[in-house]
C-alpha cells in the first residue's frame, strides 16, 4: 500500500516538472543546500548517514566486510591527505582519471569522454562546490536515471590504503573531483563493488540522458556513413575503438599509429573530390595521447595534394590539435566498434542542431499480470505491456538509394536498478522487444490490450536482434508511416522487473500506452432472473434467517458455502469471512451491516455470473485461474483496467503459485464493484476527480 501511494505521488510530481536537470530528484530525500547550511551553522563536517564510511559502502562479496581486499582501509577526507586540496585544477581533463583497484574501467572511459564536452560535464558536476568557499565536507552530483535527473549528496570521506586513494584518482595529487564523482555513483548503485563490470554506454547514458547505439565495424550497415553524418548533425557523442584480444595488446600501437583499446572520438565527416571520384573522409580525435594516425589522409599524407587546395584549407581549419582525418574505408578496416550516444532534446541548446524528439514510458513486468515472456510463450506473451507509436511525418532527408519515404526511430528498452540489486543476487534479466504494424481496422483500438489472437501467426515488422542480459537493448529502425505496437518483454515469463522504454524519432511521434483506460460497467442482475437453483438458494436463506429477516456476514458465509459445496462441477474451499463482509458492504444500502432478502437475491445472481466467468477461465478445472488470465476475466465481467491496477490485483489476490481461487476471484470482483460505485457517487461533476477530507477518505477505504 505504501509503495503504491508513493508511486502515485511520484507520478504527480513528475507531471509538475520534477526530474529535470534544473529540478532534480533529491536522492534518498537529501537536499545539498539544506545539509550544507546545517553543517556550516554547526561547524561540523558532514557525515553521510545514508552511505556511511564503513565496509558496507565498499561492497558485499569481494569487497565485503571481512574480505582480505578490504583489510587496512582507512576513510580519509582530502583535507587529511594533502595540504591544499582542490575540487578541479585547470579544468576537468582526461588526465584527472586514473583507475585504482576497482574494475570499473567502463565508467572511467565514459567520464573521460564527458570531459570533452564542458556543457554536459557541468550538468553532472555542479560548479557551486569547492574545498575553500563554504566547505563543509559535503559535495553533490547529478546523474540521469531512467528518465529523470537525480541529485546525489555525499560526504568527502574516501577509502585509502597507506595514505593513497584506493580507487579512481587524478594525476594531480591534490585534485578530487573524479574520486568524489565515483563515490557518488557508487552510492547511487549501492556500493563501490556494484560498479565492477559494465559498458561505457551505460556511463554515457547516466551522464547525458541520451540513448546509445552500438555498431560492429566488421559487419557495418550499408548506410553507416549516413548514420554518422546525421548523428553529428544532431550533436551526438560518438566513440570508436580497436578491440584487444589479450591483456598484452592493451595500449599496443598498430603499424599506422593507432592505439588498441583506447576510446577515440568521432568529430566529423566530409566528402572530397579525389582523382575525379568522391572520397568519404572521417575525422577522429585521440583524447588519451599525442599518437596520431600515419596512414592515408593523415596530416602530411600525399592524398591532400590531389584535391582542391581551397577544400584542403577548409578541412585543415576544421581539425583541431589532436584530430586527424582518414578515409572511411580505412576507418572500417582499422576500428572494431562504434558507439553513438544520441542526446535527448534537453541536452542540446543550439538551435542549429537538428534535435531528436523523445517519448518515454516507465513500466513494470509483474508476475501474474504483465510478465508474459517472449514470443516462445504465446499463452502469456500478449499480457506484456503494450505501447502504440503513431508515425505520420517522414524524415526530411531520405537516404540515398531508398525509394519509399520512411520514419527513423531509435528504440531503447532499459531495465531499472539491476546493478543496485546485485548485492541480493539479482542480475540482469534477458530483455528485448518486438514492433508490429497495426492494421487499419485496429488503429482506433487503445482502451484495452490487444489479445492473444492478434499475435498468433503475426510476424513483427522489426525486433531487437536478440534477447540480452544488458541494462539496455536498443536499435535504429526505419519504418513506413503508420501505427505500430511495441511490446517489451523479458525472455522468460514470470520475471519481475521495472523498465523504461524510450522512443527517439526524427519527427514528432504520437505515443501512448495501450490499455491505459480505466472503466467499470459490471452486469446488474434483476431478481426476476432467478431460476430453479436460485429458488433453492432463496429457500435456504429463509431457512437460516426467516422470510423477512436480514442475514449477517457469518450467516451469509454458511449459506453460500453450503450451496456451493454441493456442486460437482468445481473445486471450492468456501468463502472466507472477509469476502462475505465485502459482499455485504457492496449491497447494504441501508447501512445495517446485513442483507435483506432482495439484497441477498441480487448478490446471489452476481455470484452466479462470476461463477460462469470463472469456470470458463478455469481451463484445466483445477479450481483456480492463472493470474495473467485475470485481464480477460475482468473484461468479461465488465471491467477495463490499466496495467497498474492489473498488477495491484495480481499482488493482492493471487497465491504464491500465481493462481486465483474462486474466493479470491469473487472478492476481487465485489471489491471493484464497491470502489467504482463509491467513486461514481462522489464524482458529482463526472470529471473523473474526487476530493475528500481525511475523515471522508478513511471512511471510504475502510468500508
Swiss-Prot record:
SMART domains: calpain_III, CysPc, EFh
Domain Calpain catalytic: 45-344
Active-site residues, Swiss-Prot/TrEMBL: 105, 262, 286
GO terms for cellular component: cytoplasm; Golgi apparatus
Record PROSITE patterns: CALPAIN_CAT (PS50203), EF_HAND_1 (PS00018), EF_HAND_2 (PS50222), THIOL_PROTEASE_CYS (PS00139)
UniProt-annotated stretches for the region Linker: 513-531
Cofactor note: Binds 2 calcium ions.
Cofactor: Ca(2+)
EC number: 3.4.22.53
Post-translational modification comment from the UniProt entry: Undergoes autolytic cleavage between Ala-5 and Ala-6 which gives rise to fragments extending from Ala-6 to the C-terminus, Ala-6 to the EF-hand 2 domain and from Ala-6 to the beginning of domain III.
Domain of life assignment: Eukaryota
Single GO MF annotation: calcium ion binding
Record text on subunit structure and interactions: Monomer and homooligomer. Interacts with COPS1/GPS1, COPB1, EYA2, NME2, NME4 and TOMM70.
Protein name listed in UniProt: Calpain-8
